[in-house]
Amino acid sequence: MPDTPPGCFARVAIDVPIAHVGASLFDYAIAPELAQAARVGSWVVVPWGRGRRVGLVAERADRSEIDTARIRPLAAVLEDAPVLPPSWFELVRFCADYYHRGFGEVALPAIPKLLRTPPAPKARGSAFARARQRFVAAAAAEAGSTPPPLNDAQRAALDVLLAARGFGVHLLHGITGSGKTEVYLHWLSEVLAREATGQVLLLVPEIALTPQLATQVAARFPAHSVAVLHSDLADVDRAAHWLAAVEGRARVVIGTRLAALAPLAALAAIVVDEEHDASYKQQEGARYSARDLAIVAASQRRVPIALGSATPSLESW
């Protein structure tokens, strides 16, 4: 290819297995007409072999160590896709380094499949537009329900959480049925009231726990949209809820371990329920502990995190 002007290389994360973790980003040339759109955090379509893949611009560079004659140009920038925040790239980079995986092997599988599929040449409308239209927040059975009063032990735990500012890990230890969920909900209610655009993340270990909790949360917070993230959702529904979370339209996000890698730009608090549960450990593909990643995310974002359990793990205790 012809000489490329300085600053016109994109280092792109792609979901492909790699032999060497240090070589986890791939260099592509940026054509002048894409120079403004192809910024860090943007979504791009790139040539890969004889096909095309969706990738994420993780870095911009003035030069490349690859022979420029071998560097292929970006095929397109998906301009209706949300630009992902630097905080998310920081978390993904930690995960990739700590668990010895390629950056793209962590970043791309965390995104719903529908959104990381290259658009068909003659597609009518984008996957992002369809997903935005699809989002319907979790419905409440009894919208605006009155929270039950807390007992003394619950109130004491809540007071500790309410006093938390900045990063801190708080273990809520109580037997099953002791009312830990009520403490979470009272706390998150205060966080949402205090943070005008803040978002809260509530992780649960099993998919089966999400419907009832989502209904309960929606009833408690009728003014806020609730997004639900887990692997059993249909592709279009997962994409719709993920986009609502990423774009801040959903201020409450409930999910299983995959939600730990959701790029929430306005994260204000995290809850990990049943933090001891082995289901938080991803065993396929890029392996990680969602509980541990949630703690890292809270540290990086300087927000409080509550871990709840009747039988806490040794690490948390």
Please report, for each region that a protein language model flagged, where it lies by residue.
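Accessory, non-ATPase domains that flank or precede helicase/AAA+ motor cores in DNA-metabolism machines
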Residues: 1-317
